[in-house]
Amino acid sequence: LYRFHQWWYAERDHDHNGICEYGSTDGTLIAAAWESGMDNGVRFDDTRMLKNEMEKAWSMDQENICLNSFLYVDKLTLSEMASILGKQELSEQLAKEAEVIKLYVQTKMYDSESGFFYDIRLNDRTPVKVMGAEGWLPLWAGIATPEQAESVKNIMMDEKHFNSYLPLGTLDVSHPALRPTFGYWRGPVWFNQVYFGITGLKRYGYVEEADLLTRKFMAHAQGLMTDGPIHENYNPLTGEVLNAPNFGWSSALILRLLLDQ
């Protein structure tokens, strides 16, 4: 597990600053976007690829807020595992590295003007100002300061941004690139991002808001309150089912949402 974790820093940290980027082995942007899991996300529309030092290693030219939130949690988890195994030096090293990510995200990847977290460009550290579901990952991870979490919460609860008919879509519903029907990661609602968002709100004490969004999601996603199949994603404006039925992580995460109530 530790070797896999370290792979990111060997293959996907273009400037060796301890903050990673999604990338690919063949230098193509589409493969790098696939690596993110958010295949056609709007934040990647103007992204370019950079060759890294390792053979067959390329990075996007932007540091990714979701990836580094995941890596922060990885470091804390691995630190705890190392401590249990008696590897105290490694445990302390990982904990220190996690703090580096936390401070960087708080100070570099949060935009105080808009009150949201974003990917940032490598060349000038400016934010890629596309409000997407990745922006609440620092709440799920426990990285955000209380003030930052409150600002992100306000945006999540705003009907002009993410509190749409079916809430917590993958793109701000006021964004001109929104494609609510068959847009895949350009607006539709995915269960995993809903789960991250609701869990993040609860982590910072916004239980009432989290419960409101959970109830709204369950009531408005087509078929969830009947015997309809659970789908891959949903239209944020209508709740209409989209793409593959009987989708695995969607089904699993409904249970998590309900059990966490």
Residue positions per predicted region:
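Extended, well-ordered alpha-helical scaffold segments
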Residues: 1-8, 74, 78, 85-105, ...
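Well-ordered alpha-helical scaffold segments within catalytic/enzyme domains
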Residues: 7, 69-88, 137-148, 195-207, ...
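Extended glycan-interaction surfaces of carbohydrate-active proteins
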Residues: 14-63, 100-189, 222-261
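Amphipathic alpha-helical coiled-coil segments and their boundaries
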Residues: 60, 64-67, 87
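Peripheral, non-catalytic segments that deliver or gate enzyme domains
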Residues: 64, 182-206
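Amphipathic alpha-helix face/heptad-repeat signature
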Residues: 67-70, 94
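A generic structural signal for well-ordered alpha-helical surface patches
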Residues: 195, 199, 211, 215-219, ...
